[in-house]
């Protein structure tokens, strides 16, 4: 792709993270906050940093897309989302690396900052986070975003902080830190405007790292939506996400990729082994919505016991064929009739030679 077609390449290798390119989730946030620091009058840069911080916090705290599903606990997750946004913005604004130093503003730093603030002994009835927020100007956005947590009772605030810590705890992995603590050579804005390809390699033997793949896909797609909205609702280049083994990834808010992505020139190609994987991860309704939003379906290579073959045989529909019988005897007779038959029966689908596929297209 790089040598022949001239693509800019990034390889995020979760199987061997020490050989992987970086993928710092705070790259765009840091970049725009640095631009605002250089030119305080550049309000647009600050607004973009805040927007990307909100996208990241929502992706981490509410991967399913909506805190309402948590019922009475929705307050804690919404507050945790605002709190994490504030933490990320504080890191981006006040902890830039000095000349010659490596980037130290990343998601692990966010965890350490929360942990350090919780460890600070109370001063005049306030914890470390409240003391830090008091140092900010009253109009600072980080202070506003964390307002729900700051104004709640001590026990409620502790629950909000614990929610943030529990979500960030998943990133504490020595190998994984070799990826998420270093900037990516490709960010969402570059990905949408240049010839770029990102290869994401998952370790089949260690499904614990699959969550980071789902997180990267979800965060990148939301950033691409934001980029598209700044350019009349369409990306400059068409973006295609080939998601092999999507059925083995943890469920995430995938439905907007189908419903909102198409109009923005962003296409998702989910590759699964069985329709049952979608139903297991997204429920019956979610699986139906995903299938209904796929304009083209390519399938083949079914196992002998596959139930997916039955479902796809029904989806192919039927045709009318002429059927009958002929009897030979003293009085020869024949009987012909028109009957309905599946276009391809499940047995016929299962017997398709390896390497051959059936394609169903819309229109």
Residue ranges, per PLM feature:
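P-loop NTPase motor domains
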Residues: 1-266, 281, 342-363
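Conserved ATP-driven motor cores of ASCE-family P-loop NTPases powering translocation/secretion/packaging/pilus
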Residues: 258-361
């Amino acid at each position: 792709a790089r040598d022949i077609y001239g693509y800019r390449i990034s390889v995020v290798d979760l199987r061997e993270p020490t050989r992987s390119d970086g993928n710092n989730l705070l790259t765009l946030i840091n970049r725009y906050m640095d631009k605002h620091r250089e030119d305080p009058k550049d309000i647009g840069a600050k607004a973009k940093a805040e927007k990307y911080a909100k996208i990241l916090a929502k992706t981490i705290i509410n991967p399913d897309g909506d805190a309402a599903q948590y019922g009475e606990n929705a307050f804690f997750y919404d507050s945790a989302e605002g709190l994490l946004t504030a933490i990320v913005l504080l890191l981006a604004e006040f902890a830039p690396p000095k000349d010659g130093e490596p980037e130290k503003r990343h998601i692990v730093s966010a965890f350490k900052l929360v942990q350090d603030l919780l460890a600070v002994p109370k001063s005049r009835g306030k914890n470390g986070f409240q003391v830090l927020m008091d140092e900010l100007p009253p109009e600072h956005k980080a202070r506003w975003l964390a307002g729900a947590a700051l104004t709640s009772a001590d026990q409620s605030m502790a629950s909000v902080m614990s929610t943030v810590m529990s979500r960030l705890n998943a990133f504490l992995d020595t190998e994984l830190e070799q990826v998420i603590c270093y900037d990516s050579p490709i960010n969402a804005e570059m990905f949408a405007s240049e010839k770029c390809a990102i290869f994401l390699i998952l370790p089949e033997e260690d499904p614990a790292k699959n969550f980071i793949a789902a997180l990267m896909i979800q965060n990148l797609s939301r950033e691409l939506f934001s980029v598209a909205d700044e350019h009349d609702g369409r990306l400059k280049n068409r973006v295609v996400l080939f998601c092999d083994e999507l059925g083995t990834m943890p469920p995430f808010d995938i439905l907007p990729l189908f419903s909102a992505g198409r109009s923005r020139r962003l296409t998702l190609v989910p590759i699964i082994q069985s329709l049952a994987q979608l139903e297991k991860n997204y429920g019956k309704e979610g699986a139906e919505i995903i299938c209904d939003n796929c304009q083209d379906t390519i399938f083949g290579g079914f196992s002998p016991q596959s139930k997916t073959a039955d479902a796809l045989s029904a989806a192919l529909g039927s045709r009318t064929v002429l059927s009958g019988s002929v009897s030979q005897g003293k009085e020869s007779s024949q009987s012909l009739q028109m009957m309905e038959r599946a276009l391809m029966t499940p047995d016929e689908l299962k017997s398709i030679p390896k390497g051959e596929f059936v394609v169903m297209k819309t229109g």
